Amino acid sequence: MAPAKKGGEKKKGRSAINEVVTREYTINIHKRIHGVGFKKRAPRALKEIRKFAMKEMGTPDVRIDTRLNKAVWAKGIRNVPYRIRVRLSRKRNEDEDSPNKLYTLVTYVPVTTFKNLQTVNVDGN
């Protein structure tokens, strides 16, 4: 049997989820909307991008930039791009009466090719 853990051994450090950070990701939309009907593809793609941002950044408040919306809808409701490069920025909420201290802003990053792209941390600017 594994030894029992003692209750009072928690570290008192800042959680990384409270840090303000910006990262660039490539999202494979194609696998996320596989099997979705034609008239629901672009709306579902935006929902999946929102879900991805929620999972990666850990904030329930996700805001999608209008340029990203236009990029997803550029080829119509049916023909959504296979992949998309996005910048996720976890930011402090200026609105005091909001229940969430942080929100995630998702912006579009235009790229010519998706070959050899990694997830990268971007300096906060």
UniProtKB/Swiss-Prot annotation:
| Record's subunit section | Component of the large ribosomal subunit.
What is the recorded name of this protein? Large ribosomal subunit protein eL31
Gene Ontology, cellular component aspect: cytosolic large ribosomal subunit
Residue positions where Phosphoserine is found in the record? S15, S98
Question: Could you tell me where this protein is found in the cell?
Answer: Cytoplasm
Which of the residues bear the PTM N6-succinyllysine?
A: K55, K70, K75
Is Ribosomal protein one of the keywords UniProt gives this record?
Answer: yes
One BP annotation, GO: cytoplasmic translation
Q: Name one Pfam family in it.
A: Ribosomal_L31e
The family this protein is said to belong to: Belongs to the eukaryotic ribosomal protein eL31 family.
Residues with the modification N-acetylmethionine, per the entry, are: M1
> Native species of this protein?
Pongo abelii
| Modified residues annotated as N6-acetyllysine in this record | K75
Q: Name one GO molecular function term.
A: structural constituent of ribosome
Alphabetical keyword list: Acetylation, Cytoplasm, Phosphoprotein, Ribonucleoprotein, Ribosomal protein
Lineage per the UniProt record:
Eukaryota, Metazoa, Chordata, Craniata, Vertebrata
Does the UniProt entry include the keyword Zinc? no
Q: What does this protein do?
A: Component of the large ribosomal subunit. The ribosome is a large ribonucleoprotein complex responsible for the synthesis of proteins in the cell.
Q: Can you tell which superkingdom this protein's organism belongs to? A: Eukaryota
